[in-house]
Protein backbone atom coordinates (compact mmCIF):
# COMPACT_ATOMS: atom_id res chain seq x y z
CA UNK A 1 0.00 0.00 0.00
CA UNK A 2 1.71 3.12 -1.19
CA UNK A 3 1.49 6.33 0.71
CA UNK A 4 1.49 9.43 -1.51
CA UNK A 5 4.97 10.84 -1.87
CA UNK A 6 5.69 14.51 -1.39
CA UNK A 7 6.76 16.69 -4.32
CA UNK A 8 10.48 16.94 -4.91
CA UNK A 9 10.59 20.67 -4.19
CA UNK A 10 9.00 20.11 -0.79
CA UNK A 11 11.63 17.52 0.10
CA UNK A 12 14.41 19.89 -0.90
CA UNK A 13 12.97 22.59 1.32
CA UNK A 14 12.72 20.33 4.33
CA UNK A 15 15.27 21.32 6.91
CA UNK A 16 17.71 18.80 8.28
CA UNK A 17 16.42 16.85 11.27
CA UNK A 18 16.12 18.75 14.50
CA UNK A 19 18.18 17.69 17.45
CA UNK A 20 16.10 15.26 19.44
CA UNK A 21 16.37 13.69 22.81
CA UNK A 22 18.35 10.50 22.54
CA UNK A 23 16.09 7.54 21.96
CA UNK A 24 16.49 4.13 23.51
CA UNK A 25 15.36 0.97 21.81
CA UNK A 26 15.91 -2.33 23.55
CA UNK A 27 15.91 -4.33 20.34
CA UNK A 28 16.64 -2.98 16.86
CA UNK A 29 14.08 -5.12 15.08
CA UNK A 30 11.26 -2.78 16.06
CA UNK A 31 8.91 -5.67 16.85
CA UNK A 32 7.81 -7.19 20.11
CA UNK A 33 8.56 -10.68 21.31
CA UNK A 34 8.44 -12.68 24.51
CA UNK A 35 12.21 -12.42 24.88
CA UNK A 36 12.34 -8.71 25.55
CA UNK A 37 10.49 -5.44 25.91
CA UNK A 38 10.73 -2.92 23.11
CA UNK A 39 11.09 0.65 24.35
CA UNK A 40 10.86 3.94 22.51
CA UNK A 41 12.63 6.69 24.36
CA UNK A 42 13.13 6.37 28.09
CA UNK A 43 9.58 5.44 29.09
CA UNK A 44 7.34 4.29 26.22
CA UNK A 45 6.78 0.55 25.97
CA UNK A 46 5.76 -0.68 22.53
CA UNK A 47 2.78 -3.02 22.38
CA UNK A 48 0.88 -4.86 19.69
CA UNK A 49 0.47 -3.70 16.13
CA UNK A 50 -2.85 -1.98 15.55
CA UNK A 51 -2.27 -0.78 12.00
CA UNK A 52 0.14 -0.71 9.12
CA UNK A 53 0.85 1.22 5.98
CA UNK A 54 3.62 2.21 3.63
CA UNK A 55 4.97 4.49 6.38
CA UNK A 56 5.53 1.42 8.57
CA UNK A 57 3.47 0.35 11.55
CA UNK A 58 1.18 1.82 14.14
CA UNK A 59 1.62 0.27 17.58
CA UNK A 60 -0.25 0.55 20.82
CA UNK A 61 2.11 1.86 23.48
CA UNK A 62 2.16 2.67 27.15
CA UNK A 63 3.86 5.42 29.11
CA UNK A 64 5.41 3.52 32.00
CA UNK A 65 5.69 6.69 34.10
CA UNK A 66 2.04 7.73 33.82
CA UNK A 67 0.48 4.35 32.97
CA UNK A 68 -1.37 5.97 30.08
CA UNK A 69 -1.78 4.40 26.66
CA UNK A 70 -0.33 6.11 23.60
CA UNK A 71 -0.08 5.56 19.86
CA UNK A 72 3.38 4.89 18.39
CA UNK A 73 4.11 5.29 14.69
CA UNK A 74 7.16 3.38 13.47
CA UNK A 75 8.67 4.20 10.07
CA UNK A 76 11.74 2.40 8.70
CA UNK A 77 14.69 4.78 8.64
CA UNK A 78 15.47 3.56 5.13
CA UNK A 79 11.92 4.21 3.92
CA UNK A 80 11.65 4.95 0.21
CA UNK A 81 9.62 8.09 0.93
CA UNK A 82 10.21 9.07 4.56
CA UNK A 83 7.61 11.41 5.98
CA UNK A 84 7.46 10.82 9.72
CA UNK A 85 10.04 13.45 10.60
CA UNK A 86 8.29 15.97 8.37
CA UNK A 87 4.98 15.21 10.06
CA UNK A 88 6.67 15.64 13.46
CA UNK A 89 8.11 18.95 12.33
CA UNK A 90 4.65 20.15 11.34
CA UNK A 91 3.21 19.09 14.70
CA UNK A 92 5.91 21.13 16.44
CA UNK A 93 5.18 24.05 14.12
CA UNK A 94 1.52 23.86 15.14
CA UNK A 95 2.53 23.98 18.79
CA UNK A 96 0.43 23.18 21.82
CA UNK A 97 -1.86 26.21 21.90
CA UNK A 98 -4.45 24.92 19.47
CA UNK A 99 -7.51 23.01 20.59
CA UNK A 100 -8.20 19.66 18.96
CA UNK A 101 -4.62 18.67 18.11
CA UNK A 102 -3.08 15.44 19.43
CA UNK A 103 -0.26 15.76 21.90
CA UNK A 104 3.10 14.64 20.50
CA UNK A 105 5.19 13.14 23.28
CA UNK A 106 8.35 11.96 21.57
CA UNK A 107 10.23 11.58 18.31
CA UNK A 108 13.50 9.76 17.79
CA UNK A 109 15.28 6.75 16.32
CA UNK A 110 14.53 3.26 17.52
CA UNK A 111 16.87 0.75 15.95
CA UNK A 112 15.99 0.56 12.26
CA UNK A 113 12.97 2.78 12.79
CA UNK A 114 12.03 6.36 13.46
CA UNK A 115 9.32 6.52 16.09
CA UNK A 116 6.74 9.16 16.93
CA UNK A 117 4.68 8.83 20.10
CA UNK A 118 1.31 10.54 20.13
CA UNK A 119 -1.78 10.91 22.24
CA UNK A 120 -4.30 8.11 21.84
CA UNK A 121 -7.69 9.39 20.66
CA UNK A 122 -11.17 8.02 20.08
CA UNK A 123 -12.99 6.92 16.92
CA UNK A 124 -13.01 8.87 13.68
CA UNK A 125 -15.98 10.67 12.19
CA UNK A 126 -16.13 7.97 9.51
CA UNK A 127 -16.48 5.26 12.14
CA UNK A 128 -19.14 7.29 13.94
CA UNK A 129 -20.88 7.92 10.61
CA UNK A 130 -21.13 4.16 10.10
CA UNK A 131 -22.42 3.82 13.64
CA UNK A 132 -25.20 6.31 12.84
CA UNK A 133 -26.35 4.41 9.73
CA UNK A 134 -24.34 6.69 7.47
CA UNK A 135 -26.17 9.95 7.92
CA UNK A 136 -25.83 12.78 10.41
CA UNK A 137 -28.52 15.26 11.41
CA UNK A 138 -28.08 18.94 10.61
CA UNK A 139 -27.37 19.70 14.27
CA UNK A 140 -24.48 17.24 14.42
CA UNK A 141 -23.03 18.45 11.11
CA UNK A 142 -23.17 22.08 12.26
CA UNK A 143 -21.44 21.26 15.56
CA UNK A 144 -18.75 19.47 13.56
CA UNK A 145 -18.48 22.25 10.98
CA UNK A 146 -18.15 25.07 13.50
CA UNK A 147 -15.30 23.24 15.24
CA UNK A 148 -13.48 22.21 12.06
CA UNK A 149 -13.53 25.74 10.66
CA UNK A 150 -11.66 26.78 13.80
CA UNK A 151 -9.25 23.84 13.46
CA UNK A 152 -8.46 24.76 9.88
CA UNK A 153 -8.11 28.44 10.70
CA UNK A 154 -5.55 27.54 13.35
CA UNK A 155 -3.61 25.27 10.98
CA UNK A 156 -3.57 28.04 8.37
CA UNK A 157 -2.44 30.57 10.98
CA UNK A 158 0.70 28.45 11.40
CA UNK A 159 1.51 28.83 7.67
CA UNK A 160 0.36 25.30 6.81
CA UNK A 161 -2.27 23.93 4.49
CA UNK A 162 -3.65 20.53 5.39
CA UNK A 163 -4.44 18.92 2.01
CA UNK A 164 -5.98 15.73 3.38
CA UNK A 165 -9.55 16.43 4.48
CA UNK A 166 -11.52 13.22 5.04
CA UNK A 167 -13.69 11.90 7.89
CA UNK A 168 -11.00 9.37 8.85
CA UNK A 169 -8.67 12.22 9.84
CA UNK A 170 -11.02 13.82 12.37
CA UNK A 171 -11.29 12.01 15.69
CA UNK A 172 -13.20 12.62 18.88
CA UNK A 173 -11.47 12.39 22.24
CA UNK A 174 -11.24 9.27 24.33
CA UNK A 175 -14.05 7.78 26.34
CA UNK A 176 -14.48 9.21 29.81
CA UNK A 177 -12.35 12.26 29.06
CA UNK A 178 -13.82 15.72 29.55
CA UNK A 179 -12.78 16.53 25.97
CA UNK A 180 -14.34 13.48 24.34
CA UNK A 181 -16.70 15.85 22.54
CA UNK A 182 -13.82 17.75 20.89
CA UNK A 183 -13.17 17.02 17.22
CA UNK A 184 -9.42 16.54 16.69
CA UNK A 185 -7.49 16.89 13.46
CA UNK A 186 -4.74 14.33 12.85
CA UNK A 187 -2.21 13.13 10.26
CA UNK A 188 -0.19 15.95 8.77
CA UNK A 189 1.73 13.71 6.38
CA UNK A 190 0.41 15.59 3.34
CA UNK A 191 0.54 19.09 4.85
CA UNK A 192 2.58 21.81 3.19
CA UNK A 193 3.86 25.26 4.06
CA UNK A 194 2.00 27.80 1.95
CA UNK A 195 4.17 30.62 3.30
CA UNK A 196 7.76 30.10 2.16
CA UNK A 197 9.87 29.95 5.35
CA UNK A 198 12.75 31.77 3.63
CA UNK A 199 10.97 34.53 1.73
CA UNK A 200 7.97 34.78 4.11
CA UNK A 201 5.81 35.12 1.01
CA UNK A 202 2.88 33.05 -0.20
CA UNK A 203 3.90 30.19 -2.47
CA UNK A 204 3.38 30.99 -6.17
CA UNK A 205 0.40 29.85 -8.17
CA UNK A 206 1.26 26.83 -10.30
CA UNK A 207 -0.53 24.43 -12.59
CA UNK A 208 0.07 20.87 -13.75
CA UNK A 209 0.54 19.72 -10.16
CA UNK A 210 0.09 16.08 -9.23
CA UNK A 211 -3.04 15.34 -7.24
CA UNK A 212 -2.58 15.32 -3.49
CA UNK A 213 -5.39 14.48 -1.10
CA UNK A 214 -8.48 12.30 -1.06
CA UNK A 215 -10.40 12.15 -4.32
CA UNK A 216 -13.88 12.12 -2.81
CA UNK A 217 -13.42 15.41 -0.95
CA UNK A 218 -10.68 17.36 -2.73
CA UNK A 219 -11.47 20.68 -4.39
CA UNK A 220 -12.28 21.10 -8.05
CA UNK A 221 -9.09 23.11 -8.57
CA UNK A 222 -7.03 20.25 -7.14
CA UNK A 223 -8.54 17.94 -9.76
CA UNK A 224 -7.52 20.52 -12.38
CA UNK A 225 -3.88 20.26 -11.27
CA UNK A 226 -3.72 23.67 -9.63
CA UNK A 227 -1.47 24.32 -6.65
CA UNK A 228 -3.45 24.09 -3.42
CA UNK A 229 -3.89 26.93 -0.95
CA UNK A 230 -6.17 27.76 1.98
CA UNK A 231 -9.28 27.83 -0.19
CA UNK A 232 -8.89 24.17 -1.12
CA UNK A 233 -8.93 22.96 2.48
CA UNK A 234 -12.20 24.82 3.05
CA UNK A 235 -13.81 23.51 -0.12
CA UNK A 236 -12.87 19.95 0.84
CA UNK A 237 -14.50 20.54 4.23
CA UNK A 238 -17.66 21.68 2.46
CA UNK A 239 -17.75 18.48 0.41
CA UNK A 240 -17.33 16.47 3.61
CA UNK A 241 -20.17 18.36 5.33
CA UNK A 242 -22.50 17.51 2.44
CA UNK A 243 -21.33 13.88 2.54
CA UNK A 244 -22.45 13.74 6.17
CA UNK A 245 -25.83 15.35 5.42
CA UNK A 246 -26.63 13.42 2.24
CA UNK A 247 -25.13 10.05 3.15
CA UNK A 248 -23.14 10.02 -0.09
CA UNK A 249 -21.86 12.33 -2.83
CA UNK A 250 -22.84 12.25 -6.53
CA UNK A 251 -19.29 11.37 -7.59
CA UNK A 252 -18.98 8.26 -5.44
CA UNK A 253 -18.83 4.81 -7.03
CA UNK A 254 -17.73 5.92 -10.49
CA UNK A 255 -16.08 3.22 -12.61
CA UNK A 256 -13.23 3.55 -15.09
CA UNK A 257 -10.58 1.38 -16.73
CA UNK A 258 -7.69 3.09 -14.94
CA UNK A 259 -7.30 4.97 -11.70
CA UNK A 260 -6.28 8.12 -13.53
CA UNK A 261 -9.47 7.96 -15.58
CA UNK A 262 -11.49 7.36 -12.44
CA UNK A 263 -10.08 10.45 -10.74
CA UNK A 264 -10.77 12.39 -13.93
CA UNK A 265 -14.39 11.23 -13.80
CA UNK A 266 -14.69 12.26 -10.17
CA UNK A 267 -13.39 15.73 -10.99
CA UNK A 268 -15.64 16.06 -14.04
CA UNK A 269 -18.69 15.06 -12.02
CA UNK A 270 -17.85 17.60 -9.31
CA UNK A 271 -17.57 20.37 -11.88
CA UNK A 272 -20.81 19.35 -13.56
CA UNK A 273 -22.82 19.09 -10.34
CA UNK A 274 -24.39 22.49 -9.60
CA UNK A 275 -24.04 23.62 -6.00
CA UNK A 276 -27.82 24.03 -5.88
CA UNK A 277 -28.29 20.37 -6.84
CA UNK A 278 -25.63 19.18 -4.38
CA UNK A 279 -27.28 21.09 -1.53
CA UNK A 280 -30.90 20.55 -2.58
CA UNK A 281 -33.31 20.02 0.35
CA UNK A 282 -30.77 21.39 2.81
CA UNK A 283 -30.48 24.89 4.27
CA UNK A 284 -29.32 27.59 1.87
CA UNK A 285 -26.34 28.26 4.14
CA UNK A 286 -24.70 25.05 2.92
CA UNK A 287 -24.80 26.28 -0.67
CA UNK A 288 -23.67 29.75 0.42
CA UNK A 289 -20.62 28.20 2.08
CA UNK A 290 -19.59 26.30 -1.04
CA UNK A 291 -20.17 29.26 -3.34
CA UNK A 292 -17.98 31.44 -1.11
CA UNK A 293 -15.03 29.05 -0.83
CA UNK A 294 -15.08 28.18 -4.54
CA UNK A 295 -14.87 31.87 -5.44
CA UNK A 296 -11.81 32.53 -3.29
CA UNK A 297 -8.64 33.62 -5.05
CA UNK A 298 -5.55 31.42 -4.75
CA UNK A 299 -3.76 33.96 -2.52
CA UNK A 300 -6.82 35.16 -0.62
CA UNK A 301 -7.19 34.75 3.12
CA UNK A 302 -10.62 33.25 3.80
CA UNK A 303 -13.02 35.05 6.14
CA UNK A 304 -13.25 32.24 8.67
CA UNK A 305 -15.43 34.28 11.03
CA UNK A 306 -17.97 34.91 8.27
CA UNK A 307 -18.19 31.18 7.57
CA UNK A 308 -18.49 30.29 11.26
CA UNK A 309 -21.19 32.92 11.70
CA UNK A 310 -23.02 31.47 8.71
CA UNK A 311 -23.31 28.19 10.58
CA UNK A 312 -23.78 29.55 14.11
CA UNK A 313 -26.64 31.78 12.94
CA UNK A 314 -28.27 28.79 11.25
CA UNK A 315 -27.72 26.77 14.41
CA UNK A 316 -29.52 29.38 16.51
CA UNK A 317 -32.27 29.87 13.91
CA UNK A 318 -33.04 26.16 14.17
CA UNK A 319 -33.27 26.48 17.96
CA UNK A 320 -30.43 24.05 18.61
CA UNK A 321 -28.40 24.00 21.81
CA UNK A 322 -24.62 23.59 21.56
CA UNK A 323 -24.63 20.73 24.05
CA UNK A 324 -22.37 18.32 22.12
CA UNK A 325 -25.25 15.84 21.96
CA UNK A 326 -24.01 14.38 18.69
CA UNK A 327 -25.97 11.68 16.90
CA UNK A 328 -23.62 8.99 18.20
CA UNK A 329 -24.03 9.89 21.87
CA UNK A 330 -25.66 7.03 23.74
CA UNK A 331 -24.97 4.48 21.02
CA UNK A 332 -22.75 1.52 21.92
CA UNK A 333 -19.50 1.65 19.96
CA UNK A 334 -18.39 -1.81 18.75
CA UNK A 335 -15.11 -3.06 20.14
CA UNK A 336 -12.55 -2.30 17.44
CA UNK A 337 -9.60 -4.40 16.38
CA UNK A 338 -6.76 -3.49 18.73
CA UNK A 339 -8.95 -1.99 21.42
CA UNK A 340 -7.90 -1.69 25.01
CA UNK A 341 -9.87 -0.84 28.10
CA UNK A 342 -8.30 1.85 30.22
CA UNK A 343 -8.92 3.76 33.40
CA UNK A 344 -11.32 6.65 33.07
CA UNK A 345 -8.62 8.70 34.72
CA UNK A 346 -6.30 8.42 31.72
CA UNK A 347 -6.91 11.85 30.29
CA UNK A 348 -5.78 13.61 27.17
CA UNK A 349 -4.65 17.20 27.19
CA UNK A 350 -6.46 19.48 24.77
CA UNK A 351 -6.66 23.22 24.48
CA UNK A 352 -9.68 25.56 24.47
CA UNK A 353 -9.54 28.43 22.01
CA UNK A 354 -13.14 29.37 21.22
CA UNK A 355 -15.81 30.43 23.66
CA UNK A 356 -18.59 28.17 22.41
CA UNK A 357 -16.32 25.21 23.11
CA UNK A 358 -16.26 26.16 26.77
CA UNK A 359 -19.86 25.18 27.29
CA UNK A 360 -20.24 22.07 29.45
CA UNK A 361 -20.89 18.83 27.64
CA UNK A 362 -24.21 17.15 28.41
CA UNK A 363 -23.45 13.98 26.52
CA UNK A 364 -23.13 10.57 28.08
CA UNK A 365 -19.78 8.81 27.86
CA UNK A 366 -19.33 6.24 25.12
CA UNK A 367 -19.33 2.70 26.38
CA UNK A 368 -16.25 1.20 24.79
CA UNK A 369 -12.74 2.55 24.65
CA UNK A 370 -11.44 2.88 21.11
CA UNK A 371 -7.84 2.74 20.08
CA UNK A 372 -7.50 5.06 17.13
CA UNK A 373 -4.62 5.62 14.85
CA UNK A 374 -3.19 9.02 14.37
CA UNK A 375 -2.79 8.31 10.70
CA UNK A 376 -5.51 7.65 8.16
CA UNK A 377 -3.29 5.47 6.00
CA UNK A 378 -4.02 2.26 7.82
CA UNK A 379 -5.59 -1.06 6.95
CA UNK A 380 -7.87 -3.17 9.02
CA UNK A 381 -5.63 -5.82 10.51
CA UNK A 382 -8.25 -8.51 10.06
CA UNK A 383 -7.73 -9.86 6.52
CA UNK A 384 -11.10 -11.60 6.63
CA UNK A 385 -13.04 -8.40 7.08
CA UNK A 386 -15.53 -7.73 4.33
CA UNK A 387 -14.75 -4.04 4.15
CA UNK A 388 -11.30 -3.08 2.97
CA UNK A 389 -9.96 0.33 3.80
CA UNK A 390 -6.83 0.03 1.71
CA UNK A 391 -6.19 3.07 -0.44
CA UNK A 392 -6.04 2.73 -4.19
CA UNK A 393 -2.85 4.52 -5.04
CA UNK A 394 -2.40 5.85 -8.53
CA UNK A 395 0.76 6.03 -10.59
CA UNK A 396 3.54 8.31 -9.41
CA UNK A 397 2.19 11.33 -11.25
CA UNK A 398 -1.19 11.07 -9.52
CA UNK A 399 -0.74 11.49 -5.78
CA UNK A 400 -4.19 10.56 -4.56
CA UNK A 401 -5.19 9.07 -1.27
CA UNK A 402 -8.17 6.85 -1.95
CA UNK A 403 -11.63 7.63 -0.73
CA UNK A 404 -12.23 5.32 2.21
CA UNK A 405 -9.84 4.55 5.02
CA UNK A 406 -10.29 3.60 8.63
CA UNK A 407 -8.67 5.05 11.71
CA UNK A 408 -10.25 2.87 14.33
CA UNK A 409 -9.99 -0.56 12.75
CA UNK A 410 -13.58 -1.64 13.10
CA UNK A 411 -14.51 -5.03 11.70
CA UNK A 412 -17.50 -3.98 9.71
CA UNK A 413 -19.29 -4.20 6.40
CA UNK A 414 -19.94 -1.08 4.38
CA UNK A 415 -23.67 -0.70 3.91
CA UNK A 416 -25.04 0.43 0.59
CA UNK A 417 -27.19 3.45 1.31
CA UNK A 418 -29.33 5.70 -0.78
CA UNK A 419 -29.16 9.43 -0.20
CA UNK A 420 -30.86 10.37 3.02
CA UNK A 421 -32.15 13.81 3.86
CA UNK A 422 -32.69 15.20 7.30
Curated annotation (Swiss-Prot):
Activity regulation note: Repressed by 2-(2-hydroxyethylamino)-6-(3-chloroanilino)-9-isopropylpurine (DB08325).
PROSITE patterns registered for this protein in UniProt: PROTEIN_KINASE_ATP, PROTEIN_KINASE_DOM, PROTEIN_KINASE_ST
Compositional bias segments (type: Polar residues): 361-377
Binding site for ATP: 50-58, 73
Family label: Belongs to the protein kinase superfamily. CK1 Ser/Thr protein kinase family. Casein kinase I subfamily.
Residue ranges of every copy of the Protein kinase domain listed in the record: 44-315
Cellular location(s): Cytoplasm
Enzyme class: transferase
Active-site residues (renumbered): 164 (proton acceptor)
Superkingdom to which the source organism belongs: Eukaryota
GO BP terms, alphabetized: endocytosis; positive regulation of canonical Wnt signaling pathway; signal transduction; Wnt signaling pathway
EC number(s) from the headed UniProt entry: 2.7.11.1
Classification via InterPro entries: Casein_kinase-1_gamma_C, CK1_Ser-Thr_kinase, Kinase-like_dom_sf, Prot_kinase_dom, Protein_kinase_ATP_BS, Ser/Thr_kinase_AS
Disulfide bond positions: none
Compositionally biased region (Basic and acidic residues): 1-13, 351-360
GO CC list: cytoplasm; cytosol; nucleus; plasma membrane
Function: Serine/threonine-protein kinase. Casein kinases are operationally defined by their preferential utilization of acidic proteins such as caseins as substrates. It can phosphorylate a large number of proteins. Participates in Wnt signaling. Regulates fast synaptic transmission mediated by glutamate. Phosphorylates CLSPN.
An MF annotation (GO) of this entry: ATP binding
UniProt PTM: Autophosphorylated.
Disordered: annotated span: 1-36, 351-389
Keyword tRNA-binding: no
Official protein name in the record: Casein kinase I isoform gamma-1
Record keywords: ATP-binding, Cytoplasm, Kinase, Nucleotide-binding, Phosphoprotein, Serine/threonine-protein kinase, Transferase, Wnt signaling pathway
